[in-house]
């Protein structure tokens, strides 16, 4: 079985997340996802994500903190999806590879038809974001 490492960006602007709608011609057409793509051999996850965001969105992103990973079997392939937070980037995202974009509150994202592999990443992001530091109660 083929194993593929994929990176995804949870892009945050003013408390809202960027969701991208997959092209009707691609895999999982019409579903919403965190933008990203495959990690090339010899490439680090942050480098791959910065490259993918430039190719897909025409932005120059500075990759922030690691969020979570999720493994899923899709069409006879094992996909290891790794999410990273992005708060800082140059340029305005453009839909070069996606049908549409939406900026939404994190909880609102569950109202979109999300790609199944992205749901646990969103849940992990929200649990970290909503966590209370020890000793702050």
List PLM regions with ranges.
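Conserved N-terminal beta-strand and adjoining loop/helix that marks the start
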Residues: 1-17, 38
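Conserved beta-strand segments that form the floor/walls of ligand-binding pockets within enzyme
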Residues: 18, 33, 85, 102, ...
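A conserved beta-turn-beta hairpin within the catalytic core of GNAT-like acetyltransferases
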Residues: 26-31
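The catalytic Nudix box helix
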Residues: 34-66, 105
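Active-site-adjacent beta-strand/loop module that shapes the phosphate/pyrophosphate-binding cleft
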Residues: 60-61, 69-93, 100-106, 125
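C-terminal structural segments of small proteins and small subunits
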Residues: 91, 103-120
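Charged phosphate-binding loop/patch that engages nucleotide di/tri-phosphates or the phosphate backbone
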Residues: 117-137
